[in-house]
């Protein structure tokens, strides 16, 4: 058995037993019995355009893991985000491009969560994604302002 497969099995046991992804209301696990193919999900960060959403992602590994980054990490839930491909869900983020063998699956999930909370407009997937995501985020900000303004009238008086 390769060290990559052993490492993935260890990480699966750790994720299940430790509950490490509970803080982001998520999980990750192998697809059926294929330890090299994983699905996971996270809940969108609070007070962000992705709040209350459930975001699924997929990861594919080689037996060279963790010495080599996953060969594919992508969002499965359609999303407007400047660092995520609208059509294929490919994610453009530094956690993968700066891969080190100490990185792990939980780290990937946390990096995706952080990317939803703090998009990186300096490194967009492409210019179309950047403009659509900006529009989506502006609409979110307007909805929040309207919501706050409307709720400011509720001061508890009964007429």
Predicted regions and their residues:
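Proline-anchored loop/turn motifs at beta-strand termini and strand-loop-strand connectors
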Residues: 59-70
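N-terminal leader/pro-regions and domain N-caps
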Residues: 1-33
